[in-house]
Each structure stands twice: as C-alpha cells, then as structure tokens.
Amino acid sequence: RKPQPYALFDIMEKLHFAPGEMLVLDDLKPGYDMARAANVPFAAALWSNDIPEIEAFMRGNCGLCFKTVAQFRDYLFSGKEA
C-alpha cells in the first residue's frame, strides 16, 4: 500500500528496471512519497480532483504536472525524459 515503496522495488527487481527508467503517475501525496522513497520520477495527475490544496502541493513539489489525460499522452509520445 502507498506510500510503502515495496511495489516499485518489486517491479525493478523482477523486470530489471532502474529507477530512472520508471515513472509514477498519481494524484495524491502518498504516491509522491512512494516514488521519492524508491527514487523513481513522479508525475502529478491533476485531472482527478479539484482540491486546491492538493493541486498546490503537487505543483510546488512535482517536476511534471498534467491537468488532462491528453497532456500526459502527449508527454509520453514526445520522447522527453522525466
């Protein structure tokens, strides 16, 4: 369960991924905390709620923030790295 990073470590071990080869996309702070604990880049999914405090935290702490699924899709296919 988030924010425990076990799931990310398990994926890295089983699929031989390095932290920088992964991206956690989540809409809440526990997902952010989980990604940080595993040293995995994090992106904020801001389309899932309209709570100003959550959006402010995400925008203030996350390098990648997406307001729509379309924005995230465009990022995924842009070839840019997190």
For each feature predicted by the language model, list its residue ranges.
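Asp-based, Mg2+/Mn2+-dependent phosphohydrolase catalytic module
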Residues: R1-A82
